[in-house]
Structures are given as C-alpha cells and as structure tokens.
C-alpha cells in the first residue's frame, strides 16, 4: 500500500480535501484542522528521519492491535498474527505506535464520550517494556528513541484519515451516527 504510514503524504491529502471542501464541512472541522496543521513539523519527523537514513525500514504489520492476534483458548498465548494484507516495509515506531494507540487506550475505538478516552500510562509502559524485551536488541538507538513519538504520530495520523474522509463525504469509513 503506497504511502500507508507516510504522514507527510497524509497531510498533503488532508490539505487537498480541506481546500476542495466538496461537502462544505471545512468550517465545522476548523478546530481539528488547526490542531493537525499546527503540528505539521512534528508529524513529519519520522518521515524525514527515514529519508535521511536515521531510521531503517523494517518488515512491519501496520495494523498492530490485539484483535489481529489469534490466541489459544486454553493458554491465552499467541498462536499467530492475522490480517497480513498490510505487511510491508515500514518503521518500527509506527507498528509500536499503532499497538499503543489501540492497546493503551482507556476506551474502545468507537467510544463517543471523549471524556472517557485517555492514554493509560500503565499499559503504555507495559507495551514499551514488552516491545523492548522482544525486539529491542534488533532496534537502533534512534528507533528506540522515537517509539513514544510513533505512538503520538500514528494516533494523529489515524485522526487525519478519519477527518479527510469526513471532509470527502464519509467514503471509506462508514459511519452510523450523526456527524
């Protein structure tokens, strides 16, 4: 999937959708667009580091959440990884970040009460410890340093994808409640 976690490209796509405003939703989405575009420099950090050679490409899953792991019913141990259609070269920080986005959240992905959604630091620390125990020996110092940034960027990147789709008329992410 070309440019899947290319946050700079996602920013360009979002900007184009905002400029086109085909559904007349930009005014309503103004605060969200301001939030994202005011962080543009930070959001491009991983892309710039990869282009400069500071971060290597790895084999990544790109949809690292618990429901993409088949667990043994008796032992609870992982049997295999599922949903392999997004496996491709990518950054370790993106896989780690996506796992944290999903697994260290205080609420389900589709929670509508925003006051219930926050990062569970205990779960974040557990993810970080487990990730480094399992593969830290294979990561560069730069990769380890940007793992926290990966969690932030991937979370905002997914928000950008949702926002772009909203501006475009809810084409990819189907919704079942008022916008």
Describe each PLM feature range.
Residues 64, 123, 147:
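Active-site capping/gating regions of soluble enzymes
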Residues 53, 67-108:
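Catalytic activation segment of kinase domains across protein kinase-like and atypical kinase folds
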Residues 1-61, 66-80, 153, 174-178:
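ATP-dependent phospho-/nucleotidyl transfer catalytic cores
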Residues 89, 93-137, 153-172:
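Active-site activation/catalytic loop segments of kinase-like enzymes and analogous catalytic loops
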Residues 41-49, 84, 102-105, 133, ...:
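Conserved helix-loop functional segments at active or binding sites
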Residues 139-151:
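All-alpha amphipathic helical-bundle segments outside canonical DNA-binding/catalytic cores
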Residues 36, 127, 146-147:
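A structural signal for short hydrophobic/aromatic patches embedded in well-ordered alpha helices
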Residues 1, 135-142:
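Surface-exposed helix-capping loop/turn segments at secondary-structure junctions
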């Amino acid at each position: 999937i070309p440019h899947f976690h290319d946050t700079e490209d996602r920013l360009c796509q979002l900007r184009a959708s905002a400029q086109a405003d085909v559904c007349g939703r930009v005014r309503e989405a103004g605060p969200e667009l301001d939030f994202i575009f005011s962080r543009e420099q930070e959001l491009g950090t991983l892309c710039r580091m990869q282009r400069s050679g500071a971060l290597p490409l790895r084999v990544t899953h790109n949809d690292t959440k618990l429901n993409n792991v088949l667990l043994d019913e008796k032992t609870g141990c992982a049997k295999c990884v599922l949903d392999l259609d997004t496996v491709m070269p990518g950054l370790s920080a993106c896989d780690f970040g996506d796992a944290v986005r999903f697994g260290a959240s205080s609420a389900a992905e589709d929670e509508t009460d925003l006051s219930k959604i926050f990062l569970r630091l205990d779960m974040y620390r557990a993810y970080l410890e487990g990730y480094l125990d399992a593969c830290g020996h294979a990561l560069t110092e730069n990769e380890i340093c940007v793992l926290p940034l990966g969690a932030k960027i991937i979370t905002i990147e997914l928000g950008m994808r949702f926002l772009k789709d909203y501006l475009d008329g809810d084409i990819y992410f189907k919704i079942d409640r008022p916008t």
